[in-house]
Design a protein with these regions (language model features):
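Catalytic center-proximal scaffold of phosphoryl-transfer enzymes
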Residues: 2-3, 8-9, 101, 158-542
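Short, flexible loop/hinge motifs at secondary-structure junctions
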Residues: 1-181, 224, 253-254, 393-396, ...
Length: 542
């Protein structure tokens, strides 16, 4: 708080003292104005996230700016008048004939009784005998029947010896192994529960209510117990085998999101984390997603996961990942350009839209334009082989990246924007992350951003909005295992319900007397295995 001077004190001040007071007040006023601008920016950004579109694309931002001066922004006298052919609507493209037949060909068909016209009605309408039958008209409709329930009654033949060496000894028919001993759960029932909760992001209490509406009384506690027991017994070794596949790849990606676990928190509302690790975006042969629940967010968690890994890890700017780069000789950390541009996008969203010209000449907007050019070129290269993509990146993108960092350093050195503003924070971020942001230029298999892992974790983020929290660490760990399988199945074009049903049917057969599973036998059950039945695979539209 500045000292307040009375009129009498100011009248008694010398010229030099008055100059000192004025300069001091100007400095304080500049600081206040800077703080006010920063607070206004924060409010606008918060409102944008709350009420605006959650997009950072430059096209969307341009559209928002041009809304206020559409005529001036759209005016271009050099554009020629359009021809009549360009103005008049073209003939509508009709739907491909036979597509409905193709879509319905794999479903069972039921021929219904024909809709007949009686002879009496025909004679009345046409006159007696003045008619003949034509070819029948047929059409198809798709019928859906709600889920059905069947109680399976298994019969095991039992014999007893009445003489000889095995007198009074019992012999029973060989029965299949139960999924869970003594439980009524079957692979199809548990697969249905897993599909609703983890694939369709519904809470177990809603599953319980739907079951009750169908006359089936299975509590959510029972369903939760089934999930945890099967996860520990079957899914844990299954996901371990998937993890081996992931860590054999040269490029992986990682991200994390907070979650609440009631029974594993030190204090109310404390955050635990669900980490996701996935194969690189350009690896299409055997894509893998691994979820991992951890109580904290320190670097020890990813350090343990990637301890024996040798390759490139694409992440956001979290310092924990940078420590992996320093502590693990085999790991190279690459940063995400989508995160690098976020602060600039926020700054443009928070700018005064009533003055589009000043926005488009701002440092933040220029930064977005430069980064958008990287993306535009890299998008053109997505379908190329890795070697060709690398060559094109070195030739076309690398000079632009070098120019961007030189420009960013110049803007920071000239203090063209307040350091604490979103633009200033963005400049500081990219300058300090320069080495990590350039890694994608060294290998054609490294993606420009970490969007693949963010897509992989999206299903979990949608789900936690519905079920809010986990009760125990065991439940969170079981969820991580199930999400790993379901998300990997989707990436491999499988139908999660049928895939869960199949592996839950097969996995009990792989258990020895102690309940252990040989990892090598799991290869034929992996989401990319050729041995999977056709019903597990997602049908392709021709």
């Amino acid at each position: 708080m500045a000292d307040r001077h009375t009129l009498e004190e100011l009248n008694n001040c010398s010229r030099d003292e008055l100059i000192t007071i004025v300069l001091m007040m100007q400095g304080q006023l500049d600081t206040l104005n800077e703080n006010i601008e920063r607070l206004i920016e924060q409010v606008r950004i918060a409102n944008s996230y709350r009420f605006g579109k959650h997009t950072e694309t430059l096209d969307s931002i341009d559209g928002q700016l041009s809304f206020f001066d559409e005529a001036e922004n759209c005016c271009n006298l050099s554009v020629p008048e359009p021809a009549a052919e360009e103005v008049l609507p073209s003939r509508r493209n009709h739907k491909k004939k036979g597509q409905r037949e193709t879509d319905l060909k794999d479903f069972p068909e039921e021929i219904l009784p024909p809709y007949q016209v009686s002879t009496e009605e025909l004679d009345t309408f046409y006159g007696a005998g003045n008619w003949r039958r034509m070819k029948d008209e047929t059409y198809k409709r798709l019928r859906h029947e709600p889920e059905s329930w069947t109680v399976e009654i298994h019969t095991v033949e039992v014999y007893v010896g009445t003489g000889g060496d095995h007198q009074d000894e019992f012999l029973r028919g060989k029965r299949p192994k139960d999924l869970l001993r003594g439980s009524i759960v079957t692979p199809s029932l548990l697969a249905s529960i897993l599909n609703v909760k983890y694939v369709n992001s519904s809470a177990l209490h809603r599953v319980e209510q739907e079951f009750q509406r169908n006359g089936v009384n299975i509590s959510r506690q029972t369903m939760s117990n089934w999930i945890i027991r099967c996860a520990e017994k079957y899914f844990a070794p299954f996901v371990d085998r998937m993890k081996q596949e992931l860590l054999s790849l040269p490029v992986t990606q990682s991200d994390e999101t907070p979650t609440q676990v009631i029974g594993d928190s030190d204090r109310p509302n404390s955050k635990c984390y669900m980490w996701v690790h996935c194969s690189g975006e350009f690896y299409k042969e055997r894509p893998v997603v691994i979820y991992e629940y951890q109580k904290g967010r320190d670097h020890e968690k990813p350090l343990e996961f990637y301890r024996n890994y040798k390759g490139v890890l694409v992440t956001d700017s979290l310092e924990q990942y940078h420590l992996l780069d320093k502590k693990l000789p085999g790991v190279t950390n690459a940063n995400c350009w989508a995160h690098a541009r976020r602060a600039f996008a926020d700054a443009v969203k928070a700018a005064d839209k009533k003055n589009p010209l000043s926005v488009k000449t701002s440092v933040a907007y220029q930064a977005l334009q430069k980064i958008a050019e990287f993306y535009r070129i890299d998008t053109e290269l997505k379908e190329l082989p890795a070697t060709d993509r690398l060559t094109q990146r070195q030739t076309r993108i690398k000079p632009l990246v070098e120019d961007f960092f030189a420009w960013a350093k110049q803007q920071a050195a000239e203090c063209t924007v307040p350091p604490k503003s979103r633009t200033g924070q963005g400049l500081n971020f990219v300058i300090h992350q320069e080495n990590y942001l350039k890694v994608f230029l060294t290998d054609g298999d490294i993606p420009i951003d970490n969007s693949a892992s963010e897509r992989a974790i999206r299903t979990f983020c949608i789900g936690k909005k519905n079920w809010m929290f986990h009760n125990t660490a065991k439940g969170a760990g079981a969820s991580a295992l199930v999400y790993s399988i379901s998300e990997t199945a989707k990436l491999n074009n499988l139908r999660p319900y049928y895939y869960f049903r199949y592996i839950l049917t097969e996995l009990p057969k792989y258990c020895d007397e102690k309940g252990n599973i040989d990892p090598e036998k799991l290869d034929q059950l992996m989401p990319w295995a050729e041995e999977l039945p056709e019903e597990c695979r997602k049908p392709r539209r021709s």
